[in-house]
């Protein structure tokens, strides 16, 4: 099947964005990541107007939904390029754009360093030997599965790169540490930062609940983190 691939391109934050279109003739079972790799393998790469263009900048590390690096807007919805297959998308035109909530680096690459900085500011590490209860093994495991891809932050109306609100990714990752930490002073520090950087800033729109590309039980983890950090349960 022949697909039209529309890509929003931009050389840097200071330059203007523009659209380029390419043709992909291949299997409907191909992933968007496979499409991008195939386009960049062309020498030279030409757009649909016949112009020779530079290779498309995008990120990937695993191609199997394990790293989160290939998160982007696919037909206006945040997804992972490696796990989004053409047959799951409507029509034969595929639109690719960078995530909009993070500073642009180039083309489909964004700088998600503020996501990781927010986790540091929440003090999400252990100061004591981890307490591991069999009763909370499953939610702790789910918390640890987070790819930190940023898809949940992309759809959050309360998150932006220049705000202190850390977003769902912080609450999801916080549960594991809140549940395992035994050192009370550090636990209180985490709880205080959690209230300031997540709980007090969440508008309860719940737009993050169904967007996770690996299907994390986001609502359950938010409830558990809130209970541990805010009410000490």
Regions found by a protein language model. Give the residues of each.
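Eukaryote-biased recognition of intrinsically disordered, low-complexity regulatory segments
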Residues: 1-22
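Short, flexible N-terminal segments of the mature chain
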Residues: 18-34
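A basic, amphipathic helix-loop patch mediating RNA/tRNA/ribosome contacts
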Residues: 40-75
């Amino acid at each position: 099947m022949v697909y039209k691939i529309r890509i929003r391109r931009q050389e840097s934050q200071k330059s203007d964005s523009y659209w380029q279109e390419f043709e992909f003739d291949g299997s409907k079972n191909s992933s968007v990541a496979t499409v991008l790799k195939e386009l960049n393998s062309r020498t030279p790469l030409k757009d649909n107007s016949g112009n020779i263009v530079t290779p498309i900048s995008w990120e990937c590390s695993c191609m199997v939904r394990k790293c989160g690096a290939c998160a982007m807007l696919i037909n206006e919805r945040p997804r992972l390029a490696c796990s989004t297959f053409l047959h799951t998308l409507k029509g034969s035109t595929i639109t690719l754009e960078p995530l909009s909530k993070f500073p642009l680096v180039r083309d489909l690459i964004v700088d998600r360093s503020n996501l990781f900085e927010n986790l540091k500011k929440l003090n999400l590490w252990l100061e004591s030997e981890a307490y591991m209860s069999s009763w909370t093994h499953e939610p702790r495991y789910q918390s640890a599965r987070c790819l930190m891809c940023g898809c949940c932050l992309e759809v959050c109306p309360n998150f932006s790169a220049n705000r202190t609100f850390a977003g769902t990714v912080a609450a999801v990752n916080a549960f594991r540490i809140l549940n395992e930490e035994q050192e009370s002073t550090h636990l209180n520090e985490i709880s205080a930062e959690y209230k300031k950087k997540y709980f007090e800033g969440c508008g309860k729109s719940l737009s993050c609940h169904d967007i996770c590309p690996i299907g994390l039980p986001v609502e359950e983890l938010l409830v558990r983190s809130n209970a541990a950090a805010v009410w000490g349960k």
